[in-house]
From Swiss-Prot:
Any one annotated GO CC term: plasma membrane
One GO term of the biological process aspect: phosphatidylinositol metabolic process
Function, as annotated: Catalyzes the phosphorylation of phosphatidylinositol 4-phosphate (PtdIns(4)P/PI4P) to form phosphatidylinositol 4,5-bisphosphate (PtdIns(4,5)P2/PIP2), a lipid second messenger that regulates several cellular processes such as signal transduction, vesicle trafficking, actin cytoskeleton dynamics, cell adhesion, and cell motility. PtdIns(4,5)P2 can directly act as a second messenger or can be utilized as a precursor to generate other second messengers: inositol 1,4,5-trisphosphate (IP3), diacylglycerol (DAG) or phosphatidylinositol-3,4,5-trisphosphate (PtdIns(3,4,5)P3/PIP3).
Glycosyltransferase among keywords: no
Domain PIPK: 25-395
EC number assigned by the record: 2.7.1.68
Stated name of the protein: Phosphatidylinositol 4-phosphate 5-kinase type-1 beta
Pfam families recorded: PIP5K (PF01504)
Positions of modified residues (Phosphoserine): 445, 447-448
Length: 539
């Protein structure tokens, strides 16, 4: 093996273990990839730029690279092979859309040996990472490569409409032929940068059937966990500020609808979690390895490649976290249920799955044995809905902000009413005091008072005769066109209208808001002498 490195979430193969894919050594595959891409991209620069046409999506270019070399190709120490490039002009457009220049693309892939990563999935694919952390190179099956070819026109249209997406960004599709074996590879964006240590990594589908990391996976230095592991570790989810949460969910919803329209399913959200509270300890204990300073974060060449760029702009809380730790590499700020500050890196992966006959059969027999709704293989529309529901309810949550303060307009209107309300209070207090004195001196009978109370109870729209109340309330009309709403609800107990035998009327409460006065009645148990508490004004 030419080179390996172990850092962050990148888990390379063991240095003394040579992997094979279709009976071909991984070192030979890596060498052929670099030679083939170096030749085809360099040859493409001589072709003039033009608009992409429909037939460009179906063009396949081929070149033969013998080990002894030719007048067009260099000599090499690998077996003879043929290198095919699919839709070269279309993929050149995709690279330009994301700001990838041909020289940068060649430098990233061909300047240094590729780094082989371990594969936590069940596909058996090989994964290679460029030394500058920019690109992932993955081997794909024939059906996946064929599906990507058919997907390209719609993929082109989607990227034109919205380059900010969590969907995989494909930069090239190639095929190496040697000894009757076809090895197809695709070049994609790297979701989890090695330069940022991932304390936790999850592969989430929204399914619970067999969605727990295996024992073998858990024994790895940097395992990739699954849905059930996430629900156990982060049972209360991950919290975002409102703006970031809305942008993230909007992006996920749009991406899932795009995948559903192409009848794609069985995709996952790859989620890397960097805990900022642990990063200082990590820096003290273990310095960053195998990532040259010139290629450290902040020098990304690819547009829309970071997680934060992919969800349509930063949230409000991003500034605070970036101020504390400027080396965020475009991670999305969040918090755990423990209050830990986090940076999240994410992207949708494994989208080259079409809901064809084999997938339908797979879901059918699994649904017979298990709960069909929990099986990861499902029809595209149901899969998208379940995926979004899981992300929205179990994984990503919005921090509930405190109730907003009143608007400036409301504050001004209340302040304006405050002075008038004081006049209403003093006027009504004095009138009621005089009325109570008159009632006691004139010896008004309790029977007549009961009749008055009874009448008010059957007619809740009526208020005991207090003319001065309306005269005082009319003062509020100088501020705005106020309305007086009256609602008196007397209990069946006759003593509620007057307290004890002193003839004290029930207290009234004014609620002042937006230029309107609401009058409600409550039983009063105050003494006659408590004039200051006769009227409560709530502002």
């Amino acid at each position: 093996m030419s080179s390996t490195a172990e850092n962050g979430d990148a888990v390379p193969g063991k240095q003394n273990e040579e992997k094979t894919y279709k009976k071909t050594a991984s070192s030979a595959i890596k060498g052929a990839i670099q030679l083939g891409i170096g030749y085809t991209v360099g040859n493409l620069t001589s072709k003039p730029e033009r608009d992409v046409l429909m037939q460009d999506f179906y063009v396949v270019e081929s070149v033969f690279l013998p080990s002894e070399g030719s007048n067009l190709t260099p000599a090499h120490h690998y077996p003879d092979f043929r290198f095919k490039t699919y839709a070269p002009l279309a993929f050149r457009y995709f690279r330009e859309l994301f700001g990838i220049k041909p020289d940068d693309y060649l430098y990233s892939i061909c300047s240094e040996p590729l780094i082989e990563l371990s594969n936590p999935g069940a596909s058996g694919s090989l994964f290679f990472l460029t030394s500058d952390d920019e690109f992932i190179i993955k081997t794909v099956q024939h059906k996946e490569a064929e599906f990507l070819q058919k997907l390209l026109p719609g993929y082109y249209m989607n990227l034109n409409q919205n380059p900010r997406t969590l969907l995989p960004k494909f930069y090239g599709l190639y095929c190496m032929q040697s000894g009757g074996i076809n090895i197809r590879i695709v070049v994609m964006n790297n979701v989890l940068p090695r330069a940022m240590r991932m304390h936790l990594t999850y592969d989430l589908k929204g399914s619970t059937y067999k969605r727990r990391a295996s024992r073998k996976e858990r024994e790895k230095p940097n395992p990739t966990f699954k849905d059930l592991d996430f629900l156990q570790d982060m049972h209360e989810g991950l919290y975002f500020d409102t703006e970031t949460y809305n942008a993230l969910m909007k992006t996920l919803q749009r991406d899932c609808r795009v995948l559903e329209s192409f009848k794609i399913m069985d995709y996952s959200l790859l989620l890397g979690i960097h805990i900022l509270d642990h990063s200082l300890k990590d820096k003290e204990e273990e310095p960053l390895q195998n990532v040259p300073d010139a290629k450290r974060p902040g020098m990304q060449k690819v547009l829309y490649s970071t997680a934060m760029e992919s969800i349509q702009g930063p949230g409000k809380s991003a500034d605070g976290i970036i101020a504390e730790n400027p080396d965020t590499m475009g991670g999305i700020p969040a918090k755990s249920h423990k209050g830990e500050k986090l940076l999240l890196f994410m992207g949708i992966i494994d989208i080259l799955q079409s809901y064809r006959l084999m997938k339908k059969l797979e879901h059918s027999w699994k649904a017979l044995v298990y709960d069909g709704d929990t099986v990861s293989v499902h029809r595209p529309s149901f899969y998208a809905d379940r995926f979004l529901k899981f992300m929205n309810s179990r994984v990503f949550k919005k921090i509930q902000a405190l109730k907003a303060s009143p608007s400036k307009k409301r504050c001004n209107s209340i302040a304006a009413l405050k002075a008038t309300s004081q006049e209403i209070v003093s006027s009504i207090s004095q009138e009621w005091k005089d009325e109570k004195r008159d009632l006691l001196t004139e010896g008004q009978s309790f029977s007549s008072l009961d009749e008055e109370a009874l009448g008010s109870r059957h007619r809740p729209d009526l208020v005991p005769s207090t003319p001065s109340l309306f005269e005082a309330a009319s003062l509020a009309t100088t501020i705005s066109s106020s309305s007086l709403y009256v609602g008196e609800h007397y209990p069946h107990d006759r003593t509620t209208l007057y307290s004890n035998s002193k003839g004290l009327p029930s207290s009234s409460t004014f609620t002042l808001e937006e230029g309107t006065i609401y009058l409600t009645a409550e039983p009063n148990t105050l003494d006659l002498q408590d004039d200051a508490s006769v009227l409560d004004v709530y502002l």
